[in-house]
From Swiss-Prot:
Example of a GO biological process term: thiamine biosynthetic process
Residue positions binding substrate: N231, M260, Y289, H325, S345, R346, G347, D386, G387, L388, R389, E425, Y452
Annotated TM spans: none
Gene3D superfamilies to which the protein is assigned, alphabetical: 6.10.250.620, Radical SAM ThiC family, central domain (3.20.20.540)
Disulfide bridges in this chain: none
GO molecular function: 4 iron, 4 sulfur cluster binding; carbon-carbon lyase activity; zinc ion binding
Protein name as annotated: Phosphomethylpyrimidine synthase
Cofactor: [4Fe-4S] cluster
Keywords: 4Fe-4S, Iron, Iron-sulfur, Lyase, Metal-binding, S-adenosyl-L-methionine, Thiamine biosynthesis, Zinc
Cofactor note (record): Binds 1 [4Fe-4S] cluster per subunit. The cluster is coordinated with 3 cysteines and an exchangeable S-adenosyl-L-methionine.
Residue segments, region Disordered: 1-29
Amino acid sequence: MSATQKNNITRLEQLDRQSTQPFPNSRKVYLTGSRPDIRVPVREISLADTPTAFGGEKNPPVFVYDTSGPYTDPEVRIDLRKGLPDVRSRWIDERGDTEILPGLTSEFGQARLADASLDALRFAHVRTPRRAKPGANVSQMHYAKKGIITPEMEYIAIRENMKLQEARAAGLLDQQHPGHSFGANIPKEITPEFVREEVARGRAIIPANINHTELEPMIIGRNFLVKINGNIGNSALGSSIEEEVEKLTWGIRWGADTVMDLSTGKHIHETREWILRNSPVPIGTVPIYQALEKVNGVAEDLTWEIFRDTLIEQAEQGVDYFTIHAGVLLRYVPLTAKRVTGIVSRGGSIMAKWCLAHHQENFLYTHFEEICEIMKAYDVSFSLGDGLRPGSVADANDAAQFGELETLGELTKIAWKHDVQVMIEGPGHVPMQLIKENMDKQLECCDEAPFYTLGPLTTDIAPGYDHITSGIGAAMIGWFGCAMLCYVTPKEHLGLPNKDDVKTGIITYKIAAHAADLAKGHPGAQIRDNALSKARFEFRWEDQFNLGLDPDTARAFHDETLPKDSAKVAHFCSMCGPKFCSMKITQEVRDYAKENGLSDESKAIEAGFQEQAARFKDEGSVIYRQV
């Protein structure tokens, strides 16, 4: 065994231990469907009883959406060198419309497999790929249009509901503000039939390549919970396979619904295989990045044949959605000339350069129907890239951006003709007053295909804090109807994010997505808020920590000033101290009302005023007293 292999194994063993830690006071629960192999994971957070001083009652557990896969299940033995357990193979086999290939069919994939020098880096258990039988279409959209409810659709319905019926019966939905959904059609309960209808209509997608059988199915659409994406990937300047797998497991632990591998450095093929085999969430890529590497970074040397081989290579590995910049047309490129920041999309700039060098139309546009044929053979979803997105607020909503968006709408209809699933990528940098126009125009141009935006960043003045500038825009556009939000880390515009940056970006965007769900009035969205608020009022500190998006940070901040265990039951924190805690004072008012037989707090407060006034008179009505 080489030194490199030994180092890889040691690092991966460390990742194994780190990735399998359950959240505090939480356990993985599986909700079963109509068949025993539909086992949908949710996280159950157990809560302490309400103290006697606050009425003394049992608090039901809170169920939350769980993207962490088997990693947080102590019953599952995780070995990153072997990959995750299979979830979907039986479902795919039962449909009878796919075939196992004799081996990899892409030229590049075959060449990498034959290169013995890569053995130390290669994932050891490379699976034989499958593909649709000749003439077959294996997309979830195709099944949906035929009226078929797949196991994936049933799985998603259970996952989106998270025991909503039980919560409603327990009265947990009674305290939720009505939302404003801007025309979205959010039902009181998600059913498998509703999932099928939304996918058939094109309003939602299920990114689920038939070669990614480790996947736990999820859905992206404006009538479902708002999802978030986390980006990982190496660059020519750094990172390793182990670091990228670590970012993957770390990102999904904190709530990434999908992950994009944006690698542009060495060993892109091998890195992607490790990521896919260990990912329970959909993986997206930008295939033009790898195609560019194959021509040594010279955009003019790109060809349709190289790109086509790259699509097949990645589809056979199991990539669930491709960002394809087919809307960057030759006639739009001059529209960017007077922009403050020009073309900021890597994929957009690559295709713009190719178009200008050859003075030909974008080959991704001219070969789009051929791309659709590949996509439906593996059920890869389109994420139609916004190659002309604004890179500064000054460039927002200009002719180049909206011209491309109109073309993406045209391409969406072509993809739907082939029953290929589509979502649309969006900006970028947009000031707050222009965000709704983006959402409205996307719904109009793309006929309600799911929107997937990078932020948008609402101001350009905060390098190092762009997770905040973009989180503001993300919450807004999520409320207006955006289906998935691509996270931004503090390193945006500055450098390659590390593990800590990934966590910060994920938590920021979980906040934005949840705020959007609350504003839309998504059924059950407020259950967790209510449970945490109740725990806060009752000084159940551990429950406060555990119900939060980041229990570790909440606990650490509390313990910076009050580290002793006794502080975990104290009726105050270090912000106000014991005498100025508003919640403690409120409880004292309630206790006073109860002791004095008063029916409400306002009467208790008034009685307290009268009692103090009488005491003042009894003591001589003296303002200042000698002490």
